[in-house]
A protein has these predicted regions:
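N-terminal presequence-like segments and the immediate start of the first folded domain
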Residues: 1-60, 64-77, 83-217, 223-337, ...
Length: 412
């Protein structure tokens, strides 16, 4: 399918060092929007430490990107926000509410399905927020259906965001948390109950859209960092994936998991999801791909209605040990090679990627260089390939020693 890649031009924000990725990629009725940064044309951070100013910067950048395609923020069906807050958990909700009051200046009504999580950081010191999204155009945009199930949770302040959107046979499920209609966490201290509660919310979105768990193509697991069961010692992320297996009903979805902090104190996880209703959905399972952190019940990739979703790839041996410990570039190369091998199962290549997500683990002084290393490795592995891209610094990945993870969406 023909793609329209828009690279930054003129005075648009840019990464340092000439790293090139598309600001937007339009394909068919969808527009994939890169993580929008609070940077200038030389990659210098604007308004460092000022969350209100930075929030306006990234929304203005997203708005400008859409205007260039004769679109607007009201065309968004998905919006992901990664933000940084290093204060006490008890102050995190107030910080989010203050940030969101600025976001409310830009949210359309009805708004997109949205996920917002507290990341460890961004590629450059002083960055506090980035946003990415998916927008719809044409007949699909006109015929979209908002999904707001009865009995779902709600936010602690009034926002016009949506629990989900149905566009044809696609269902965008926004971030789900274990909360009630006032935004108050429920099942605090019970990871299994929180996880099942969230899947119940996801199930309601799917049901109201005429779909079911058998139509899931991707699940994103944002888990509380540095968390283990105090009795068994099992990592929260491993237990979340075990419970998630209860909801596999058809072709297994792909999974990407990474550690964050959560919106409200007492929450252990947030999940969002993508579903596509297609009776010919196919799991992609390359031979000898290597090890992974996801249970074998999940797919490496899923092909549904011409769209390819690849779960989080890491440099993991078949025995679960980490490859190339301490060597970020080697891990990044392995990860990108694995993306390519999964794509080959669908007769696709890295050049078919429309959205690439990078998850980086590193110390404060390392992260900027790690990000630029990932960009250089990408250019070596897939020259002249410019997908939309979002890089996030996360607290940790599912296995200690992993420094890098990537997942992607591709359309042939």
């Amino acid at each position: 399918m023909q793609k329209e890649n828009k690279l930054p031009v003129d005075d648009m924000w840019q990464w340092k060092g000439g790293a090139k990725f598309s600001n937007t990629v339009a394909v068919g009725d969808q527009v994939f929007i890169s993580g929008q940064q609070t940077l200038d044309k030389d990659g210098v951070v604007l308004n460092p430490g000022d969350i209100a100013a930075q929030t306006r910067n990234v929304f203005e950048n997203m708005k400008s990107s859409l205007v260039g395609l004769n679109m607007g923020l009201d065309d968004l069906v998905r919006l992901n926000t990664y933000y940084v807050f290093e204060g006490d958990d008890k102050d995190a909700t107030t910080f989010w509410e203050d940030m969101t009051r600025v976001r409310l200046e830009y949210f359309p009504d009805p708004g997109p399905a949205a996920t917002a999580v507290r990341a460890k950081g961004m590629p450059y010191e002083g960055q506090l927020i980035q946003i990415e999204g998916v927008a719809l155009r044409g007949e699909s945009r006109r015929c979209r259906q908002r999904i707001m199930p009865e009995g779902s949770w709600d936010w602690s302040i009034a926002v016009p965001l949506s629990q989900g959107w149905k566009i044809g046979n696609r269902i965008f499920v926004g971030g789900q948390i274990s909360a009630d209609k006032t935004g108050r966490p429920v099942h605090v201290g019970d990871l299994d109950a929180q996880t099942r509660n969230i899947y119940e919310y996801i199930g309601r979105v799917l049901s109201d859209a005429g779909a079911s768990f058998s139509d899931l193509t991707r699940v994103k697991i944002c888990f509380k960092y540095d968390s283990k069961d105090p009795n068994s010692g099992q990592a929260f992320v491993d237990r979340i994936m075990e419970v998630s297996k209860e909801y596999i009903k058809g072709t297994p979805p792909v999974v990407t998991a990474f550690a964050v902090d959560l919106l409200y104190p007492g929450l252990d996880l947030e999940l969002d999801a993508m579903a596509i209703v297609d009776q010919d959905t196919k799991a992609l399972a390359p031979n000898e791909l290597g090890g992974r952190y996801q249970p074998s019940e999940f797919s490496d990739g899923v092909l549904a209605d011409g769209e390819i979703y690849i779960g989080g790839q890491t440099a993991t041996e078949p025995d679960g040990s980490v490859m190339f410990p301490g060597d970020f570039s080697a891990q990044a190369n392995e990860v990108f090679q694995r993306l390519d091998r999964v794509l080959q199962e669908a007769d696709a290549t890295l050049k078919d990627i429309v959205k690439l997500n990078l998850f980086i683990v590193g110390q404060d002084a390392q992260v900027e260089e790690f990000f630029h290393q990932a960009c250089r490795v990408w250019t070596e592995v897939s020259p002249n390939s410019y997908p939309a891209m979002t890089p996030v610094r996360v607290h940790e990945l599912p296995k200690p020693g992993l420094l890098f993870q990537a997942d992607c969406i591709a359309i042939k």
